[in-house]
Amino acid sequence: MNVGDSVRRALDNWDRRAWGAAVLHAGNAVDGTAKKRYPQLGVATRFKRTIRDSLDIFHIMTAPGIDFDQTRFPVAVNSDLSDKRPDIADVLYGIHRCGHDHESELPNGFELTPHGPRTASVHIWRDGKIQLPASVALGLVAVAVFATENKGEVIPGDYRLSWYQHVFQISGWWGWQDHFREIISVAQFSQVTLDFTESWESWTPL
């Protein structure tokens, strides 16, 4: 399946409030993008690197108040970072890798908070489950849509992303990463590095 189809399916499921399916299809869009950008790398490495390349875009569309660059998550996923403490790219690859066995639901250990008016947040429960905002689907879609490798992808004209007063018709915004970054550069958000001190005490690296 190509990137355009994956983005379309992600947003169709988003509109139906089928959050799990939206995230899984959005992950497929990032996977397709990563394959174009880093064809010589393995699936896990290229998927994570593509997210880290565009962490500013993912962050602004997912949860502007969370510092995803510095936050680490004490959950049971593999990390390729030197200290083995998973970052958001590791967590999202954990969903993507296991999600191929689930057509519409996230794999065990991952939950989503339905999208709504409350500020997006992340929780880690005592049983080790991580609860992410459903808006991670929009963050992943944005990473794919604005990636320069995806200029020329095709999607019907009524699909769009929005950020405050800005509306981005996806059919005309494929690959316009630099321009999107210019638009969001005016944003001023206070970012918080999430503190999971208690959960780290019982965490062990994979």
What are these regions (language model features)?
Residues 156-206:
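Sequence termini and other peripheral, non-core segments
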Residues 1-24, 28, 41:
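Charged alpha-helical initiation segments
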Residues 15-18, 34-38, 101, 105:
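Hydrophobic/aromatic-lined pockets within catalytic cores
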Residues 25-71:
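Short, contiguous, well-structured surface segments enriched in hydrophobic/aromatic residues
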Residues 4-7, 48, 94, 98:
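Hydrophobic core segments within long, regular secondary-structure runs in both alpha-
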Residues 53-177:
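Long, charged low-complexity segments
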